Amino acid sequence: MRILGLDLGKKTIGVAVSDPLGFTAQGITTIRRANKEKDMEELRKICDEYKVETIVIGLPKNMNGTIGPSGEIAMEMGKLVEEALNIKVEFWDERLTTVAAHKAMLEADLSRSKRKKIVDKVASTYILQGYLDRISK
């Protein structure tokens, strides 16, 4: 059982996948967004390669817990992904995942250009790992 984690951005989609047992998340790629059809094609390839059964999408929430415009866009994308790929989609609160990703990369002493290239992939790993930790309890 593999689970895919997605961090949706305007220009890129960070992608992480669980190990086969669903204990750990590993960042695997960052998809450069083009259009809905090409984005779905890229996701389909990844889902087929890893035999994904569930997709977890980071849901941006305001600090007070409400869902704003970015959250609504993520929910629309989730519906599109579920229909296009016929794979169950769940959402995970992604508040502060990008902040945590930046902090971890700074502590690892990565250059600014390197951080910029992988921040979405790292954030998707945080999203997926949070979800995996919850379902394993």
UniProtKB/Swiss-Prot annotation:
Keywords: Cytoplasm, Hydrolase, Nuclease, Ribosome biogenesis. Its main location: cytoplasm. Gene3D superfamilies: YqgF/RNase H-like domain. Disulfide bonds: none annotated. It holds the Pfam family RuvX. Could be a nuclease involved in processing of the 5'-end of pre-16S rRNA. This is Putative pre-16S rRNA nuclease. It comes from Clostridium botulinum (strain Eklund 17B / Type B).
